[in-house]
Amino acid sequence: MPAPIALQLYSVRDQLAKGFEPVIRQLADIGYVGVEPAGFPGTTPEQAAKLFKSLGLQVCSAHSGLPLGDDKNKVLDMAKTLGLKHLVSGKGPDDFKTVELIKKTCDLFNQSAQVAEENGLTFSIHNHWWEFELLAGKPVYKYMLDYLDKSLLFEVDVYWVTTAGANPAAIVTELGKRAPLLHIKDGPCVKGQPMTAVGDGKVDVPAVAKAGAATAEWMIVELDSCATDMLAAVKKSYDYLVGQRFARGNK
């Protein structure tokens, strides 16, 4: 059976800011099984959790800061309120410029994973293109695998992997059970250009779906920006992924 489909709510951040509940209801009406929050524009985690529950929407995961230092309690409280299993975060390109910086960044990730585990959660790293650039002839993510604890998971963003010139299906296969969350997005795979509905761009989505068939827990649509109407693209992405049986929806 295909993994259930969710939407990263960053995709509809502008719409949510104008009216959180109507947009979430629209996502449920489309058939999305779950959502992945990244902030709560115009609402609170408590209010959002009640709305999600009333609509039967699962919270597959959430993007947040690292559960460390001053942010620790805030992140953990949010996770408890939403009843989620997976915490997801990442770092910017400047944190991976040298091997020493990669080590320091991975140490923060390892600490985050330990805090997550102590609180019954998992911690996943969300990638962009810079984790797949070369440093001294070696992809940055390969250094990361050297320094990361084996309990640490990944949310593979297949669009940014493709944009970096790497093969997303091969990455998903390589990571296996360490990649339970897949960010499915599509477009021209050119930095700075708007994305498209899933199925309308250059990402080899069928290959990704096949690679993650046995290991992906969630297929999460995310469009950072879009060349067409965002909510229309969100629905078209759902129709494509569920219609091709690459993901499982509620309709």
Where in the sequence are the language-model features?
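Flexible, active-site-proximal loop/turn residues at the rims of small-molecule/cofactor binding pockets
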Residues: S11, P41, L68, P93, ...
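Histidine-acidic metal/acid-base catalytic patches
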Residues: M1-D29, M78-G83, L135-L153, W160-K251
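A cross-family glycoside hydrolase active-site/sugar-binding cleft signature
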Residues: A6-Y10, E36-A38, C60-H63, V88-G90, ...
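Mobile, glycine- and charge-enriched loop segments
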Residues: M1-S11, A49, K53-A62
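Catalytic-core regions built around general acid/base machinery
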Residues: Q47-S54, L108-E118, I171, A207-A211
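Glycine-rich, proline-tolerant flexible connector loops at the mouths of alpha/beta enzymes
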Residues: G34-K53
